[in-house]
Amino acid sequence: AEALNDSFCSAEEIDEDIDNVNTYDEDLNDDFISNGSVEDTEVFSSQMEAYSTEEDDSTTDGWTPLKKEPKISFKYDSETQTLSFKASEPCALPDTVSNGTRSDWYKLNKEVGNASTVIIGDNITKIGNLNFDNRKSSYPNLKNVVLAPSVKMIGRSAFYELSALETINLESVTSIDQASFAESGLKALNFNQSDVSIGVNAFADCESLETVNVKGLTYIGESAFESCSKLTSFTCDSTIPQLSSAVFKGCSSLNQINLKAVKIEDYAFINCAALSHFDFSETENI
């Protein structure tokens, strides 16, 4: 019986063992802290904080800098459906990579797809390629575009297939790239510069376009106004070096054209049934 009793620990011994275990845990915890766990935790916490704010680049006034061009910021007002851009110094809106992809600002805020008005502010010099391309129905409601005088260039397919687009001020623009406004809903165009270049298919299939007034043209590309079936009047104040092939092809309502061209290429006026007069006084080659 005495041997059996010796095999059990007394209450005092049990308490002593528990104290030893607690002391061991405290020592282990001290070792854990001394090995840098607190520092690691602080680093981890700071990384998590950075991660949590990484997607929220907007400032308190609602302007968000573009990732591809931080000098430009944008803001969208959902109440007025207005998408605005501003720049801290002269720079261009970055090109959209390819057809069907989204612009930098669209990726940051998909609400911009509801915009009815776009305002391009001072210091922005160019609208990039495919910026407002509507082939993916990215901007189905876009009706008005307001450009600052700093905007001189419109990139390739920048406003392609915007059938709702009715107005844009191009008075300060000197360069319109390929298919920039093809299949858009524009009704009138006015260029006030004397050195305007209009690219291939720039306004092709603009079925609502009625009048075009240009102070001076240095270049007008093939099919630039092809199939603008409601175009009735085209005026250019200076002599154009060359009217490219099919430039007014299918402009069936064109009846008033005030321009002179040194060279007129093939099919420039094919299927222009309403056209009855053209001044060939400075034309050297047809």
What do the PLM-derived regions correspond to, one by one?
Residues 1-71:
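Low-complexity, acidic Ser/Thr/Pro-rich repeat tracts that form intrinsically disordered stalk/linker regions
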Residues 18, 30-31, 36-42, 80-90, ...:
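Structural signature of tandem-repeat unit edges
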Residues 18, 22-25, 37, 42, ...:
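N-terminal regions of proteins, emphasizing targeting and processing segments when present
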Residues 54-57, 97-99, 174, 224, ...:
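Intrinsically disordered, low-complexity regions enriched in Ser/Pro/Gly/Gln/His and often acidic
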Residues 62, 104-105, 138, 233:
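Residues in intrinsically disordered, low-complexity segments of regulatory proteins
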Residues 65-129, 133:
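LRR flanking "cap" motifs
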Residues 109, 118, 132-137, 145, ...:
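A general structural signal for stabilizing positions within well-ordered secondary structure
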Residues 129-131, 155-158, 177-180, 200-202, ...:
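Consensus positions within tandem repeat domains that build extended binding/scaffold surfaces
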